[in-house]
Amino acid sequence: MQCGLVGKIIKRFEQKGFRLVAMKFLPASEEHLKQHYIDLKDRPFFPGLVKYMNSGPVVAMVWEGLNVVKTGRVMLGETNPADSKPGTIRGDFCIQVGRNIIHGSDSVKSAEKEISLRFKPEELVDYKSCAHDWVYE
């Protein structure tokens, strides 16, 4: 959020044909971050991750579309921006692994869990994009 890249990131997902179904701008509490990143709690970088993520607001988004988790991970690039190719979000906008600006779920199961931490089911908007028939068979 602090980098002023929200619009550019949204644009990339929309251009790919994905559909934004929920979005919130909110603070990331330490409690929520510890729950969200619970699988990393024993890693040495965990305290720094929580501190960094707690330093300002975040924009939480839910995207839908064919293979959105898998394709989204490719669009994000590698966790370490130095290993990310140009054209990926991290390859274009990041320089340090601890400040890689964006999180993407690593599986559908993780996505479902992470979505439930931030959104109620009724907050996910179901609609048909006017571009749907141009993107999908």
Swiss-Prot record:
<dbReference type="GO" id="GO:0005524">
    <property type="term" value="F:ATP binding"/>
</dbReference>
<keyword id="KW-0808">Transferase</keyword>
<comment type="function">
    <text>Major role in the synthesis of nucleoside triphosphates other than ATP. The ATP gamma phosphate is transferred to the NDP beta phosphate via a ping-pong mechanism, using a phosphorylated active-site intermediate.</text>
</comment>
<keyword id="KW-0067">ATP-binding</keyword>
<feature type="binding site">
    <location>
        <position position="90"/>
    </location>
    <ligand>
        <name>ATP</name>
    </ligand>
</feature>
<dbReference type="GO" id="GO:0005634">
    <property type="term" value="C:nucleus"/>
</dbReference>
<protein>
    <recommendedName>
        <fullName>Putative nucleoside diphosphate kinase</fullName>
        <ecNumber>2.7.4.6</ecNumber>
    </recommendedName>
</protein>
<dbReference type="GO" id="GO:0006183">
    <property type="term" value="P:GTP biosynthetic process"/>
</dbReference>
<feature type="binding site">
    <location>
        <position position="73"/>
    </location>
    <ligand>
        <name>ATP</name>
    </ligand>
</feature>
<feature type="binding site">
    <location>
        <position position="100"/>
    </location>
    <ligand>
        <name>ATP</name>
    </ligand>
</feature>
<feature type="binding site">
    <location>
        <position position="45"/>
    </location>
    <ligand>
        <name>ATP</name>
    </ligand>
</feature>
<dbReference type="InterPro" id="IPR001564">
    <property type="entry name" value="Nucleoside_diP_kinase"/>
</dbReference>
<comment type="similarity">
    <text>Belongs to the NDK family.</text>
</comment>
<dbReference type="GO" id="GO:0004550">
    <property type="term" value="F:nucleoside diphosphate kinase activity"/>
</dbReference>
<dbReference type="Pfam" id="PF00334">
    <property type="entry name" value="NDK"/>
</dbReference>
<keyword id="KW-0547">Nucleotide-binding</keyword>
<dbReference type="InterPro" id="IPR023005">
    <property type="entry name" value="Nucleoside_diP_kinase_AS"/>
</dbReference>
<keyword id="KW-0479">Metal-binding</keyword>
<dbReference type="GO" id="GO:0006228">
    <property type="term" value="P:UTP biosynthetic process"/>
</dbReference>
<dbReference type="InterPro" id="IPR036850">
    <property type="entry name" value="NDK-like_dom_sf"/>
</dbReference>
<dbReference type="GO" id="GO:0042981">
    <property type="term" value="P:regulation of apoptotic process"/>
</dbReference>
<feature type="binding site">
    <location>
        <position position="79"/>
    </location>
    <ligand>
        <name>ATP</name>
    </ligand>
</feature>
<dbReference type="GO" id="GO:0046872">
    <property type="term" value="F:metal ion binding"/>
</dbReference>
<feature type="active site" description="Pros-phosphohistidine intermediate">
    <location>
        <position position="103"/>
    </location>
</feature>
<dbReference type="GO" id="GO:0070062">
    <property type="term" value="C:extracellular exosome"/>
</dbReference>
<dbReference type="GO" id="GO:0006241">
    <property type="term" value="P:CTP biosynthetic process"/>
</dbReference>
<keyword id="KW-0546">Nucleotide metabolism</keyword>
<keyword id="KW-0418">Kinase</keyword>
<dbReference type="InterPro" id="IPR034907">
    <property type="entry name" value="NDK-like_dom"/>
</dbReference>
<keyword id="KW-0460">Magnesium</keyword>
